[in-house]
Design a protein with these regions (language model features):
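ATP/NTP-dependent adenylation/nucleotidyl-transfer catalytic domains that generate, transfer
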Residues: 127-167
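Core alpha/beta nucleotide-donor-binding catalytic domains of modification enzymes
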Residues: 1-138
């Protein structure tokens, strides 16, 4: 479903598309693939693109993803480096949407008439990140509507402090 949607949108917008499957990048599919496996697969695909001459990959991580990542890492005992969250850039990668929440990106897409698809696994509470998304984020928003933006700013400050202490 997701691949078909992306193929159709890329064709409509005349955007080149390269589709990878696990075997294309030498990633074995485990009996029970989970979030960590999916992330490794995505980055193996990104690495294959870069090896094929693509200079950089822009991901669609948002301030909402940043908040989820921070909460997830803190719950697992992260220190300052982990509290820096998703970095805006690193060699070969940029994340231009970190300044917008998921709701804001959806508003922009709606205003521009751009459709999107939501990964159906996002609805399942089988994944820790989804449990944070479904329970913690609404609770935080009830305390402060700007919670996601505030968490994103905290991650920026943590990244600066982490870089300072790494010198």
């Amino acid at each position: 479903r997701d691949e078909a949607f992306v193929r159709a949108e890329c064709a409509r917008l005349n955007v080149p598309l390269r589709v990878f499957h696990p075997a294309d990048v030498g990633v074995a599919v485990p009996a029970h693939p989970g979030e960590d496996w999916a992330r490794k697969l995505r980055y193996a695909c990104f690495d294959a693109l870069r090896a094929g001459g693509i200079d950089a990959v822009a991901t669609a991580h948002t301030a909402t993803d940043q908040t989820e990542t921070l909460l997830f890492r803190l719950a697992r005992g992260a220190g300052l480096h982990g509290a820096a969250g998703i970095r805006p850039s690193r060699p070969g990668f940029c994340r231009p949407l970190l300044c917008l929440t998921r709701a804001e990106t959806e508003q922009v897409c709606t205003a521009c008439g751009q459709r999107w698809v939501t990964d159906e696994t996002n609805a399942s509470d089988a994944y820790a990140r989804n449990r944070l998304r479904h329970a913690a984020l609404p609770a935080l928003r009830s305390v402060n509507e700007a919670a996601e933006e505030n968490f994103a700013r905290f991650c920026e400050k943590a990244a600066r402090a982490d870089a300072y202490f790494a010198q």
